Amino acid sequence: RMMGTQATASCGAVIAHHQAPLAAVRRELHAAEQRAKNEGGRDAFSITIIKRSGGALRLTANWGEPVALLNDLRAFLAADGVSRRAAYHTLEWLDAQTLPAPEGDGAMLQSLLAYQLDRQAGGPAKAQAAPLALRLTAQTLNQPAAQRIGWLRNFISVAEFLAREVRTSAAEAP
């Protein structure tokens, strides 16, 4: 029996500290899977990152471009020419309390993102700043208006967390 062309895939993933209680991690995993099914429309992924400090990041998005963008942003943030503080500087001004929710074509958001990413990059990575800003803005505008800034903050934070591991692994390589 085949699943057919209408089959969907939902996936939940949790990244946790090795000393995090396993029962809590399993609960988060179940919650992530449910978010992927409910918030993502039964064809999505949901990543939860449980920080050592006790906080958590949660990102839910559809398959396709958001996955590719997450990987590309992670690679950008891990690149040699990009400041390790790039994500933090971007998150500093990306505040839902002071920044209006992006509307229309999101030109203001795109311009601010491109400027900030470009400022924090050097070498070959600098050329990626504007295209990444364009793609980040497009994905942000796909979110409900009230959740756009929060979703973008989580997206950037998750990419930065994943980039840390790449930077650490590269620094330890002989």
PLM regions and their residue ranges:
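Charged, helix-rich terminal subdomains or tails
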Residues: R1-P174
